[in-house]
């Protein structure tokens, strides 16, 4: 039987009622599509309104830069003339492709970009009109052509100017070294062409092949067959490897000799024992004798004392 308390604990509980909310809350969140779509459309409009003249100037500057890189000018003035168009090109690209957020009126920004491209174009034209030109190997005066005239033979590479530095050839010679020149005649000719035409260097290059030959001969001597050491023959054992050495051989003795030996050993032992006994006896006798002598002396002394007292 369940008590009243157990019935309250295990009985069915009534459901708890929660009151409903009376007020209503309306949340108004701005939509993301309305903010993203206009910005994308504005970017497309700005790209469509870019001027065509600026793209033409950019193509001209890029072609000139490629020709300058192919020709490879050596003088300082020519290097300065090639660096300035590249600077104008960098200014143009930075003004055309500026990844900044669109703020304010888009039409005003496109007008400012047009003004910047016009200024860059005027600066490039004035720079080439003052007498600067593109470096070329076939030009009549100083290896420079005015702007606008193409190179007559752009595919043929120019000969090395004496003022230019031959750093790639020197670097190759330093890496290879004099002792590691190629062995074939064709490769030797190529190596001689790469070396600079100086008398001291030519003398050192002529003396380098015997050194290389000596170096190779040393390598061949070292790479010869190794010395073979003479192996000593193994020790010939008189018994099998599994078994141990044979026992030591004793001298052959007859039984009579064995008996004689045993008897002599016994006699020696007896003699030793007798010697010990005799020593003991002698010691005892000596003691007794000493004692007897002492007693006799004492008696004499006593008798002498008694005789003297009687008198």
UniProtKB/Swiss-Prot annotation:
Per the record, where are the segments of Basic residues compositional bias? 213-222, 291-305
Residue ranges for the region (Disordered) are: 48-99, 186-229, 291-311
Residue spans of biased composition, Polar residues class: 78-97
- Provide ranges: composition bias, Basic and acidic residues: 48-61
- Which domain of life does this protein belong to? Eukaryota
Q: Which InterPro entries match?
A: POM121-like_prot_1
> What family does this belong to?
Belongs to the UPF0607 family.
Q: What is this protein called?
A: Putative UPF0607 protein ENSP00000382826
């Amino acid at each position: 039987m369940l008590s009243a308390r157990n019935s309250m604990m295990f009985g069915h509980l009534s459901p708890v009622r929660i009151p409903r909310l009376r007020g209503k809350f309306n949340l108004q969140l701005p939509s993301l599509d309305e903010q993203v779509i206009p910005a994308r459309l504005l970017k497309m409009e700005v790209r469509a309104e870019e001027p065509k003249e600026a793209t033409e100037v950019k193509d001209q500057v890029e072609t000139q830069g490629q020709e300058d890189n192919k020709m490879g000018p050596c003088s300082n003035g020519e290097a300065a003339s090639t660096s300035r168009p590249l600077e104008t090109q960098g200014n143009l690209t930075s003004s055309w492709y500026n990844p900044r957020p669109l703020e304010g009126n888009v039409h005003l920004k496109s007008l400012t970009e047009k003004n910047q491209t016009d200024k860059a174009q005027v600066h490039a034209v004035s720079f080439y009109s003052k007498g600067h030109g593109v470096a070329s190997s076939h030009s009549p005066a100083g290896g420079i052509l005015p702007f606008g005239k193409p190179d007559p033979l752009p595919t043929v590479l120019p000969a090395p100017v004496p003022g230019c530095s031959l750093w790639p050839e020197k670097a190759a010679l330093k890496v290879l070294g004099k002792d590691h020149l190629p062995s074939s005649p064709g490769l030797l000719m190529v190596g001689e062409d790469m070396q600079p035409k100086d008398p001291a260097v030519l003398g050192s290059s002529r003396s380098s092949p015997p050194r290389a030959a000596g170096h190779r001969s040393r390598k061949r001597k070292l790479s010869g067959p190794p010395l073979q050491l003479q192996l000593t023959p193994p020790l010939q054992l008189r018994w099998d490897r599994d078994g141990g050495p044979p026992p030591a051989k004793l001298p052959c003795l007859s039984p009579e000799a064995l008996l004689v030996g045993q008897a002599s050993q016994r006699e020696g032992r007896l003699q030793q024992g007798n010697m010990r006994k005799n020593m003991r006896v002698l010691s005892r006798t000596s003691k007794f004798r000493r004692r007897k002598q002492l007693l006799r002396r004492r008696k004499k002394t006593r008798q002498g004392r008694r005789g003297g007292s009687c008198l």
